Amino acid sequence: MSGFSLSDLESIVAERSKAPPEQSWTAKLVAGGQPKAAKKLGEEAIEAVMAAVTGDRDNLTYEAADVLYHLLVVLKIAEIPLENVMAELERRTAQSGLKEKASRQSS
């Protein structure tokens, strides 16, 4: 297993977002704003779902990487650090998923 993490990818996204858009796909997405980045995230998510449904493990791995990358771009544009998402995941894992869902529905 590699030592590469989502935090590493977040740092790469942050660095590449500073480049001129004609030199970096990340910078181009960021320059296009949230609508463009979110649309691309949605496209990649659909491709991942299709790979999952068809049982294409190799393509699912590839598309999952695209989803994670594009999610980090969307978070970058929204100025939401990955740390915030991880804190929310940690909060949610402190209780069962069914209890967490029920608490959202009663709010």
UniProtKB/Swiss-Prot annotation:
EC identifiers of the protein: 3.6.1.31
Annotated pathway: Amino-acid biosynthesis; L-histidine biosynthesis; L-histidine from 5-phospho-alpha-D-ribose 1-diphosphate: step 2/9
Subcellular location: Cytoplasm
InterPro entries: HisE (IPR008179), PRib-ATP_PPHydrolase-like (IPR021130)
Keywords: Amino-acid biosynthesis, ATP-binding, Cytoplasm, Histidine biosynthesis, Hydrolase, Nucleotide-binding
Top-level taxonomic group: Bacteria
Any GO CC annotation of this UniProt entry: cytoplasm
Record's catalysed reaction(s): 1-(5-phospho-beta-D-ribosyl)-ATP + H2O = 1-(5-phospho-beta-D-ribosyl)-5'-AMP + diphosphate + H(+)
Entries under NCBIfam families matching the protein: histidine_hisI, PRK00400.1-3, PRK00400.1-5
Protein known as: Phosphoribosyl-ATP pyrophosphatase
Organism, scientific name: Rhizobium johnstonii (strain DSM 114642 / LMG 32736 / 3841) (Rhizobium leguminosarum bv. viciae)
Gene that encodes it: hisE
